[in-house]
């Protein structure tokens, strides 16, 4: 006790502003459930596993720790499993996470000799008792909100429900025997709550479902709400009500009244149809989900170094799939595992290592690659009975990598490709003082775009990138005859949803990866291109090639496209991807003998003409509603003149902006530096980035297009020397080599949008394919090579 009293000055009583870590070691993935428990520094409130707490004592001199140990309670192993009603984990109605219960014990430990004192104890100094009680009762800094619904969010009351006008048509809806008013469909039927029309729903992605008559009726009449027949029961909240203008499932608090208008007694109705959410749950177990996750196959669990699963933190599968592949590359393994120990990273880290990207990447690398946490758990998989591993939760890494990013720091599902690009950018910036150690460089390569003007002169635009984003030319499908026969069969037999349950019956276009690469390298016209040779606008021809070949080639398949009306759609397509590809023919050769470069410079008036101007009709309509002219112009510009409704929504959400009354300006000084930084990360020069943002009103996507369409925008980096005597890849720090690559990683996506569904990784390790599905790791017997969203290749030389 005297030893403790002599160190009281090193004990702090936590303030409300203190971040208290007590669930996970900040250096490793040890927890209170680990064999050695967890040690909380009673001065900094950081937590350490038993193997690492001495490092903290050596670094800080803090001797007093709260030791937390959790021991598992015995529980019955034959708990009945309930069928989930919500696409979620660990919440009421969702999938049971089957978490065991633990008993927690505490003691005070004084380093360096690990002298232990019991807690609670009246003999402890009051300061220590208060400090420990505060830590024990506090919510740990690591603890995040548990996993909510993967895709479905809580339904909101429709803004049209309370003011819905119903037509007195005398229509009485029978309790059964329904049929679409415009075709012979008898399932997936929707009752329009305005006029009583019964119409079929949308056509599904695979060609099944309805014939779109309900949504077409809305487009013709603008009648907003419809309820799905077959989902109406005495529990009206369970009925599936859809709002077309809000484009979502909604609640109608007056549904009973609206149904009574058509003679429907909801209390006598019985449920015969699945709701949209239930159908989504059902589809999540269908073809894509089963194929990509290899459901139904006996996957052999695999354990050991490099085979550690990642716990899903709640819609974090995009992060898990990406990081498993990233930490299968030699560059990341070398940087954060082979050549950097945990102790080395901790010694270099600031006072709070939980906020240090280098520390947390090293922690994640050692967690995934050491094999320490890849061992069979005492609990077996509830569905297969096979040994399972608990996996490691990448909470601290996610907090650091997502810091200050509105989307990645949320619990919402994200695009795995966006996350990969974000990761590469963060790692590159963190390595700016030691570029030789930057592992993200292994993904980088040079791109050169050649612009051929009708004058015969050429321009070259060079930049760096870390992905090749490929359009999918569906017209290059190799199974056109099979597709045609399939669609004729469907049309002839009228195949319904229940007739197409077998995945073998679904025929999709098969497009070779070679066709996607050829499409990328093919010539394409550029409309409204300003030619400095002709001194006017014209149509030029652009061809694209690579100036270097990276160590790791990342190919992104553009499966998500926009249909007419800016409706997102996922292409239902297979990509035939060989194990080995050769892109040698895609190397760009630069300025060729006999070619003459376009003169430098773009007139200021051309740049000014590219600046966005508010649509006068949109502005006039908003002004007539009582908004100021300036505010309306800003709303139109910031929504790219998309329409009155979009501009109105922007206005309502930005009325409190501090600069809402500032004059509209396109000056360079008003350009957001973060937007400039984003374009810099794409490999553009700063002066080009600023010109592009100025010309596009600050819109990054439009600015990128502007750069591509104006390759002569900068004298500094697009002159003769840039084409004639440009740096070699080696001189610019880019890796380079031959054009042959071997497939080693696939990130696959299941779902209708990159922002919902689920991501899974398949990785070629030690000559065999392995599936990484969050914390489930097993030998893959049928990797979905033709269903990938992002493909990772390693250069063979």
Swiss-Prot record:
GO cellular component: cytosol; nucleus
Stretches assigned to the UBA domain: 613-654, 670-710
Zn finger residue spans: UBP-type: 156-266
Organism: Arabidopsis thaliana
Tissue localization of expression: Constitutively and ubiquitously expressed (at protein level).
Function, in words: Recognizes and hydrolyzes the peptide bond at the C-terminal Gly of ubiquitin. Involved in the processing of poly-ubiquitin precursors as well as that of ubiquitinated proteins. Involved in seed and embryo development.
PROSITE patterns, A to Z: UBA, USP_1, USP_2, USP_3, ZF_UBP
GO MF entry, a single one: cysteine-type deubiquitinase activity
Similarity field: Belongs to the peptidase C19 family.
SUPFAM superfamilies from the UniProt entry: Cysteine proteinases, RING/U-box, UBA-like
A Pfam family that the UniProt record links to this protein: zf-UBP
EC assignment: 3.4.19.12
The protein's name in its UniProt record: Ubiquitin carboxyl-terminal hydrolase 14
Catalytic activity line of the entry: Thiol-dependent hydrolysis of ester, thioester, amide, peptide and isopeptide bonds formed by the C-terminal Gly of ubiquitin (a 76-residue protein attached to proteins as an intracellular targeting signal)
Highest taxon of the lineage: Eukaryota
BP GO annotations: auxin-activated signaling pathway; cellular response to gibberellin stimulus; embryo development ending in seed dormancy; leaf morphogenesis; protein deubiquitination; proteolysis; regulation of cell population proliferation; root hair elongation
Residues involved in Zn(2+) binding: 180, 183, 200, 213
Keywords: Hydrolase, Metal-binding, Protease, Repeat, Thiol protease, Ubl conjugation pathway, Zinc, Zinc-finger
Location of the active site: 317 (nucleophile), 758 (proton acceptor)
């Amino acid at each position: 006790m005297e030893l403790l009293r002599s160190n009281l000055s090193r004990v702090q009583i936590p303030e409300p502003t203190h971040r208290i870590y007590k669930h996970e070691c900040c250096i490793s993935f040890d927890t209170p459930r680990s064999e050695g428990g967890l040690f909380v520094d009673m001065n900094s409130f950081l937590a350490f596993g038993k193997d690492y707490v001495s490092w903290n004592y050596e670094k800080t001199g803090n001797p007093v720790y709260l030791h937390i140990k959790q021991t598992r309670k015995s529980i019955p192993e034959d708990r009945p499993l309930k069928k989930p009603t919500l696409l979620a984990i660990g919440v009421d109605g969702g999938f049971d996470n089957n978490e065991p219960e633990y008993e927690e014990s505490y003691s005070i430990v004084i380093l360096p000799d690990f002298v232990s004192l019991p807690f609670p104890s009246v003999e402890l100094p009051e300061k220590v008792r208060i400090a420990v009680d505060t830590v024990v009762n506090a919510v740990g800094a690591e603890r995040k909100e548990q996993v909510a619904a993967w895709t479905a969010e809580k339904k909101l009351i429709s803004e049209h429900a309370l003011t819905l006008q119903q037509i007195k048509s005398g229509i009485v809806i029978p309790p059964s025997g329904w049929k679409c008013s415009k075709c012979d469909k008898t399932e997936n039927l929707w009752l329009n709550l305005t006029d009583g029309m019964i119409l079929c729903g949308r056509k599904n992605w695979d060609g099944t479902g309805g014939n779109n008559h309900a949504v077409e009726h809305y487009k013709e009449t603008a009648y907003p709400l419809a309820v799905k027949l077959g989902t109406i029961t005495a529990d009206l909240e369970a009925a599936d009500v859809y709002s077309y203008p809000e484009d979502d499932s909604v609640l109608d608090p007056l549904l009973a009244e609206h149904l009574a208008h058509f003679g429907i007694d909801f209390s006598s109705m019985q449920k015969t149809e699945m709701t949209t959410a239930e159908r989504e749950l059902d589809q999540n177990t269908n073809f894509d989900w089963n194929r990509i996750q290899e459901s139904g196959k006996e996957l052999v669990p695999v354990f050991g170094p490099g085979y550690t699963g990642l716990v899903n933190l709640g819609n974090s599968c995009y992060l898990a799939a990406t990081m498993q592949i990233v930490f299968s590359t030699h560059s990341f393994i070398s940087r954060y595992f082979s050549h950097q120990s945990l102790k080395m990273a901790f010694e270099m880290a600031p006072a709070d290592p939980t906020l240090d990207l280098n520390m947390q990447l090293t922690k994640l690398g050692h967690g995934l690659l050491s094999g320490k946490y890849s061992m069979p758990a005492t609990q077996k998989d509830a569905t297969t009975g096979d040994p399972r591993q608990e996996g490691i939760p990448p909470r601290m890494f996610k907090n650091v990598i997502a810091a200050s990013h509105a989307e990645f720091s949320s619990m919402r599902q994200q695009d795995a490709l966006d996350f990969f690009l974000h990761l590469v950018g963060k790692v590159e910036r963190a390595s700016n003082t030691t570029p030789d150690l930057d592992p993200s460089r292994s993904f980088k390569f040079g791109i050169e775009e050649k612009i051929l003007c009708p004058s015969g002169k050429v321009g070259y635009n060079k930049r760096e990138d870390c992905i090749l984003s490929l359009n999918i030319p569906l017209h290059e499908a190799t199974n056109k005859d099979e597709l045609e026969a399939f669609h004729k069969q469907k049309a002839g037999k009228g195949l319904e949803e229940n007739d197409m349950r077998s995945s073998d019956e679904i025929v999709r276009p098969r497009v070779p990866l070679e066709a996607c690469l050829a499409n990328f390298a093919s010539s394409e016209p550029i409309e409204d291109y300003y030619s400095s040779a002709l001194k006017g606008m014209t149509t030029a021809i652009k061809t694209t090639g690579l100036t270097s070949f990276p160590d790791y080639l990342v190919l992104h398949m553009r499966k998500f496209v926009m249909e007419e009306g800016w409706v997102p759609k996922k292409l239902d397509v297979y990509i035939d991807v060989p194990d080995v590809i050769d892109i040698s023919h895609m190397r760009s050769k630069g300025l060729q003998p006999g070619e003459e470069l376009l003169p430098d410079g773009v007139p200021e008036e051309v740049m000014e003409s590219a600046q966005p101007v508010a649509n006068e009709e949109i502005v006039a309509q908003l002004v007539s509603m009582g908004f100021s002219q300036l505010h309306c112009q800003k709303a139109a510009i910031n929504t790219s003149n998309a329409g009155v409704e979009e501009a109105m929504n922007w206005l309502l959400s930005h009325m409190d902006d501090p600069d809402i009354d500032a004059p509209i300006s396109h000056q360079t000084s008003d350009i957001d530096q973060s937007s400039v930084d984003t374009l810099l990360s794409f490999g553009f020069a700063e002066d080009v980035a600023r010109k592009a943002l100025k010309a596009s009103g600050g819109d990054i996507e439009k600015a990128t297009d502007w750069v591509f369409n104006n390759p002569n925008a900068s004298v500094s980096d697009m002159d003769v020397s840039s084409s004639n005597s440009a740096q070699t890849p080696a001189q610019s720090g880019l890796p380079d080599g031959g054009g042959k690559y071997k497939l080693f990683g696939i990130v696959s996506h299941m779902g209708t949008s990159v922002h919902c569904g689920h991501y899974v990784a398949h990785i070629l390790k030690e000559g065999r394919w392995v599936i990484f599905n969050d914390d489930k790791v097993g030998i893959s017997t049928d990797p979905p090579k033709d269903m990938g969203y992002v493909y990772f290749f390693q250069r063979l030389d």
